[in-house]
């Protein structure tokens, strides 16, 4: 009976949140921008929010990209006086974007690319494209669709549509045509965009060439929204990139890390490897953990090793699939390849063998939290459980300096402290002189 009552209460609370969210959306005078795509959407969201923050007041919702997150944001966030709301819409399965589109009713929708991520849920590129298109279909009358001109599945969303369309890409006919792409770490990404207003030269904080795509998408959207070209270029140059998305992590008198351990879909593994191949440092190492979203056999780990071996002085595989590399005994004996089971073992190995100035790529799906290997150079990392089950990164979690078995009590303690502080504020407000 108690369980039934709890369910009824939970349903009522959620319905109230949805009602408040819809009411807040209806009353808001902000320009709503929705961003989706198989990859790059988080960077577009963060960068576009950063650009618009130099032009007006902005609320940016990044990484928390579900309908529940959208409802919570709209129902709890005061949008009065906000000029722009930038929201990342993720697709974890079929019919997950449509509810967000219906709730958001965006003035602008951006689609970065269509790839076969979440393979189990979608199975085909056509199914992925159909899901992403739902954000375009949700545009308000007279809305703007910002589309990748180089992706046939994305550009197909331009027709049939009643909305304005702006395209970006390397295609000659793109409205925002990208040229002169260059990145070779430590040189950061630079490129040019040719558009109807002229040419905009961009200097970014990103270490890899493939970030031209999300940067171009954000720039195209900002220019279409009326942000001056000079302000766009200045804001792009000052962005603080998202943690663990090709994040540069430099240790004084120690190694340099590129942390790319938030996701590792098979379709984009080569982009991280290409970044390492272009880097102009003397010594390179690649640490590869879990690969996700691939069809076919686990020989993908073997293919990845063959590519990584041509780029790096040493390749380290870690996790439950480390044995699938196909590395020969000669490579193992020569130290070209190491097969380790846990992030802690990798951390210890790198600590013993690190060379000042070397570049180390940490690449994996988020389940292994390989970012701990780099964090251990600047923090006393005590959470070394191989797989903790948490989806957010270690920095966002904030408990990497606390042993995993103490996390629950630590979180409870923080909640109690927040409640007590709130209670004291209430008492203080009530006892102040009138």
Name what the model sees in each region:
Residues 1-17, 162, 220-434:
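ATP-dependent carboxylate-amine ligase
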Residues 2-149, 153-162, 376-381, 385-386, ...:
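Phosphate-binding loop of NTP-binding sites
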Residues 29, 83, 107-108, 143, ...:
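The start of beta-strands in P-loop NTPase/AAA+ ATPase cores
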Residues 56-63, 168-170, 335-338:
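Conserved RecA-like helicase motor-core motifs
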Residues 64, 150-151, 171, 290, ...:
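Residues in the short beta-alpha loop(s) of Rossmann-like NAD(P)-binding domains
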Residues 89-117, 155-201, 242-245:
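Extended acidic/charged loop-beta regions that coordinate divalent cations
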Residues 103-116, 203-241:
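A conserved, hydrophobic alpha-helical segment in the catalytic core
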Residues 144-148, 164-169, 314-320:
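Short, hydrophobic beta-strand segments that form beta-sheet elements in well-ordered domains
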């Amino acid at each position: 009976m108690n369980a039934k009552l709890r369910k009824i209460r939970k349903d009522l609370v959620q319905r109230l949140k949805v009602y408040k969210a819809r009411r807040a959306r209806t009353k808001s005078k902000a320009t709503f921008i929705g961003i989706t795509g198989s990859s790059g959407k988080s960077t577009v969201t963060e960068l576009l929010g950063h650009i618009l923050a130099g032009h007006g007041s902005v609320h940016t919702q990044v990484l928390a990209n579900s309908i529940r997150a959208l409802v919570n944001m709209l129902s709890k966030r005061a949008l009065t006086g906000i000029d722009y709301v930038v929201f990342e819409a993720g697709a974890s399965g079929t019919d997950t974007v449509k509810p967000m589109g219906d709730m958001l009713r965006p003035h602008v929708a951006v689609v970065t690319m269509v790839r076969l991520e979440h393979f189990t849920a979608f199975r085909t590129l056509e199914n992925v494209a159909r899901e992403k298109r739902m954000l375009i279909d949700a545009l308000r009358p007279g809305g703007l669709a910002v589309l990748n001109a180089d992706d046939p599945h994305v550009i197909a969303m331009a027709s049939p549509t009643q909305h304005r369309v702006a395209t970006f890409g390397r295609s000659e006919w793109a409205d925002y045509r990208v040229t002169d792409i260059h990145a070779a770490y430590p040189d950061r990404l630079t490129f040019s965009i040719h558009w109807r207003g002229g040419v905009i030269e961009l200097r970014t904080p990103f270490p890899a060439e493939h970030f031209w795509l999300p940067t171009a998408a954000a720039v195209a959207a900002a220019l279409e929204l009326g942000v001056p070209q000079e302000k766009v270029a200045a804001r792009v140059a000052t962005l603080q990139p998202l943690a663990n998305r090709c994040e540069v992590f430099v240790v004084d008198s120690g190694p340099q890390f590129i942390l790319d351990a938030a996701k590792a879909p098979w379709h984009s593994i080569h982009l991280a490897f290409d970044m390492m191949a272009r880097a102009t440092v003397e010594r390179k190492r690649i640490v590869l953990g879990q690969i996700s979203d691939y069809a076919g056999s686990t020989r993908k780990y073997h293919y990845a090793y063959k590519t990584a071996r041509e780029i790096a002085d040493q390749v380290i595989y870690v996790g439950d699939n480390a044995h699938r590399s196909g590395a020969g005994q000669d490579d193992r004996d020569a130290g070209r390849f190491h097969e380790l089971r846990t992030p802690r073992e990798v951390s210890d190995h790198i600590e013993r063998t690190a060379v000042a100035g070397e570049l180390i790529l940490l690449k994996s799906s988020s389940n292994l939290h390989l970012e701990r290997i780099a964090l251990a150079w600047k923090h006393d990392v005590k959470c070394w459980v191989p797989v903790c089950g948490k989806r957010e990164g270690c920095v966002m979690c904030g408990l990497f300096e606390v042993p995993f078995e103490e996390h629950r009590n630590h979180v409870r303690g923080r909640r109690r402290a927040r409640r007590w502080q709130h209670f004291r504020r209430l008492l203080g407000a009530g006892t102040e002189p009138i």
